């Protein structure tokens, strides 16, 4: 596995999510700096590390795939070692349910691995696991499948996107100059968004791939559904607000335009931590993974410093891969980078 240190920004996702078994129900992971927003590892990446431990735990039972997962993030994660403790809630023939707890601070080099007087519960999860490749049962088409919302966005000229960063319909969303150091997690991805207006009002459609060239596997889905371009808010915004953001130079002196653009410039000073995240896997990706996925993101309400997200993930054939729902907050970036109380010393 990765070393006990925080690790650099160049690690591959598959390397940065390795889980080492310490005993029958305890695993060690290493949260890598390259997957951080500010000082905090991305919540989806951290969740993927936990699910890697769960997959290893249930692999001998032939249930390596996550079917559903509910994550809560009561405390802020840090880079470096963490302990994942697994409780078998119910071990079934087709589906098993686990309770996962990720601990940091005061970690020990031998059993019991954590010091409960110092260590902190950082992330909690209830998860269900199965084998998606052998799962079978009744299927039927739904009315949703014939609605406009179910239509797959136009398939990109993927080679043009990789070579030139754009095609006729899509263009890469690039971080503004100076943002990369703060948003290392976003540099792990290439996000391609509509070149013009959102395909649907208040909806972000995008094609994504890993910047490293790695294929996206089943184990990456928790990270997929929690990774968004820096300008996502401009797509989720109401059409009238988006019009102000994109107003012509002739309107640059308008008070409304100036006010909206001033607030938009404050985006770099904001942090959007996830409070709760739910995931449901709809189908199994190929074992070797895929290069491209289509992701659709929408929000019902952004109000008083909190917001919801609904995420739909599909493959290039339009097959539904995963669904996810989030509750998140909008906080000052100082809440991300400020010092935490309590000891975080680890001996692992």
Curated annotation (Swiss-Prot):
UniProtKB keywords: Hydrolase
Molecular function in Gene Ontology: hydrolase activity
Pfam families: 4HBT_3, 4HBT_3C
Known pathway: Secondary metabolite biosynthesis
Keyword Hydrolase: yes
Enzyme Commission number: 3.1.2.-
Superkingdom of origin organism: Eukaryota
Functional note: Thioesterase-like protein; part of the gene cluster that mediates the biosynthesis of wortmanamides A and B, reduced long-chain polyketides amidated with a specific omega-amino acid, 5-aminopentanoic acid (5PA). The PKS modules of TwmB are involved in the synthesis of the polyketide backbone, whereas the non-canonical C domain of TwmB is a bonafide condensation domain that specifically selects 5PA and catalyzes amidation to release polyketide chain.
Name under which the protein is recorded: Thioesterase-like protein TwmA
Species the sequence originates in: Talaromyces wortmannii (Penicillium wortmannii)
């Amino acid at each position: 596995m990765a070393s006990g240190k925080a690790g650099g920004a160049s690690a591959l996702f598959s390397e940065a999510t390795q889980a080492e078994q310490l005993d029958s129900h305890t695993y060690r992971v290493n949260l890598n700096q390259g997957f951080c927003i500010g000082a905090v590892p991305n919540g989806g990446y951290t969740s993927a590390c936990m699910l890697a431990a769960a997959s290893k735990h249930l692999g001998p039972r032939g249930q390596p795939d996550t079917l559903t997962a509910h994550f809560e993030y009561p405390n802020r994660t840090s880079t470096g070692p963490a302990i994942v403790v697994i409780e078998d809630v119910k071990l079934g023939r087709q589906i098993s349910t686990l309770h996962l707890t990720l601990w940091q601070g005061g970690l020990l080099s031998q059993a019991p691995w954590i010091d409960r007087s110092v260590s902190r519960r950082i992330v909690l999860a209830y998860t269900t696991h199965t084998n998606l490749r052998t799962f079978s049962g009744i299927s039927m088409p739904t009315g949703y499948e014939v609605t406009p919302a179910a239509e797959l966005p136009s398939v990109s000229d993927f080679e043009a996107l990789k070579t030139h960063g754009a095609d006729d319909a899509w263009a890469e969303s690039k971080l503004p100059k100076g943002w990369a150091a703060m948003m290392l997690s976003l540099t792990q991805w290439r996000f391609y968004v509509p070149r013009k207006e959102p395909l649907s009002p208040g909806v972000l459609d995008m094609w994504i791939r890993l910047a490293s060239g790695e294929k996206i596997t089943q184990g990456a889905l928790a990270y997929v559904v929690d990774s968004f371009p820096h300008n996502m808010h401009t797509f989720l915004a109401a059409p009238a607000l988006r019009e102000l953001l994109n107003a012509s130079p002739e309107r640059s002196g308008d008070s409304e335009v100036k006010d909206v653009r001033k607030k938009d410039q404050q985006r770099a000073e904001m942090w959007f931590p996830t409070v709760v995240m739910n995931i449901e896997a709809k189908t199994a990706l190929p074992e070797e993974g895929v290069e491209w996925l289509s992701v659709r993101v929408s929000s019902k309400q952004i109000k008083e410093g909190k917001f919801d997200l609904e995420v739909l993930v599909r493959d290039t054939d339009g097959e539904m891969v995963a669904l996810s729902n989030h509750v998140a907050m909008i906080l000052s970036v100082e809440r991300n980078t400020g010092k935490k109380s309590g000891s975080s010393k680890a001996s692992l």
